[in-house]
Amino acid sequence: MRIEDLRKEDWKLNERLEYLAKRGEILEEEYEKSVKEILKRVREEGDRAVIEFTKKFDGVELTPENMEVPFEELEKAYEEIEPEVREALEFAENRIRVFHEKQLENSFFKEEEGIILGQKVVPLEKVGVYVPGGKAAYPSTVLMNVVPASVAGVEEIIMVSPKPNKYTLAAAYIAGVSRVFQVGGAQAIGALAYGTEKIPKVDKIVGPGNIYVALAKKLVFGTVDIDMIAGPSEVLVIADERANPTWVAADMLSQAEHDELAASILLTPSEELANKVKEEVERLLSQLERKEIAQKSLEKFGTIFLVKDLYHACEVANYIAPEHLEVMVREPMALLPELKHAGAIFLGDYTTEPLGDYVLGPNHTLPTGGSTRFFSPLGVYDFIKRSSVLYVSREGFKRVANQAEAIAKAEGLTAHALAVKVRKND
């Protein structure tokens, strides 16, 4: 794991920093052509293309008849998993539900002398949830994506996941998924966006995935809505000299094991801590079941940056705009006002990112690749839409007609002005 020095006035010119800050753009250029081809074929060929790509990328032989997982399999998985895992998933589901219920919006109406104005809030009808599979299975991702949709009142929740295991299926049962299809990758995103013979077209697609999934979501946006660009995972840790190097290293490795394209970054003003964390990462790496994946991730995107002080660390963190931001310093609350761009901010030594992944309650589906500058964590608000509601009586019309007509004439829209004028004589 490399150590870079940013304690200079021109720190933004550091090549490694620029590489990490712009990694979303770099990855897109590399994979976009193949993703476009996959989407094109799914749109034109439907299930046939989905089945072909599933065999090619996942090594799974599908037919139109077995693409959908029978609901009985979800119930069976729920009953078969270990009692402690079932209890943990139900515990997490409840905490996630309670947190997200606070995000619910209500319709409102305001009345004023012949005019009623308001906003009607309604849930989306049909949503697609992508849950990663393959190299790892994520029942927690099922809960984090499905529960907010359930809280919002979405009528039909369609889940897609390549080779879902019993824990993923059990979580789908607990969270209230409507239907499950065992497909993944860009082909699954295309199927949800365009619809196939078996997989229904949805109104919105949510959920994290690899670079193929993230790019596919970006490319189908407009045909359907999406939650965000949630690609390979990232963690950035700000730590001072008193931070525990083993804890810091463990938290960095917890992201590196996700994906070979995951990024693990440390910002610290302490050279001593930087060297100790580097040693601990190397020591702990050998203990991981997924050490090969973590090793490749660290080689590509793992970096320790030396900074001038903690406020400089905040400036660098805002420049990178990470998915997960951990603050392991003596007074973490003091830095919170300085932190502008992060999907989730974990304050304090004990607030390790995996707690947020699983059981705390706030959503773990977060924007990546620098998109925390304009995207927010997944929430109930992603599964609702708003319609403006307007009512004007004859009396209310007289209060606003002249002004509306004047603006219409100024814009040269005579039919607009006429629509107002013809009502004045009533």
Curated annotation (Swiss-Prot):
Zn(2+) binds at Q255, H258, D357, H416. SUPFAM superfamilies: ALDH-like (SSF53720). Substrate binds at S233, Q255, H258, H324, D357, E411, H416. Keywords: Amino-acid biosynthesis, Histidine biosynthesis, Metal-binding, NAD, Oxidoreductase, Zinc. It holds the Pfam family Histidinol_dh. Its cofactor is Zn(2+). InterPro entries: Ald_DH/histidinol_DH (IPR016161), Histidinol_DH_CS (IPR001692), Histidinol_DH_monofunct (IPR022695), Hstdl_DH (IPR012131). The keyword Nucleus does not apply. NAD(+) binds at Y130, Q187, N210. GO terms for cellular component: cytoplasm; cytosol. GO terms for biological process: L-histidine biosynthetic process. Pathway: Amino-acid biosynthesis; L-histidine biosynthesis; L-histidine from 5-phospho-alpha-D-ribose 1-diphosphate: step 9/9. It is an enzyme of class 1 (oxidoreductase). Its EC number is 1.1.1.23. The active site is at E323 (proton acceptor), H324 (proton acceptor). Belongs to the histidinol dehydrogenase family. NCBIfam families: hisD. This is Histidinol dehydrogenase. It comes from Aquifex aeolicus (strain VF5). The gene is hisD.
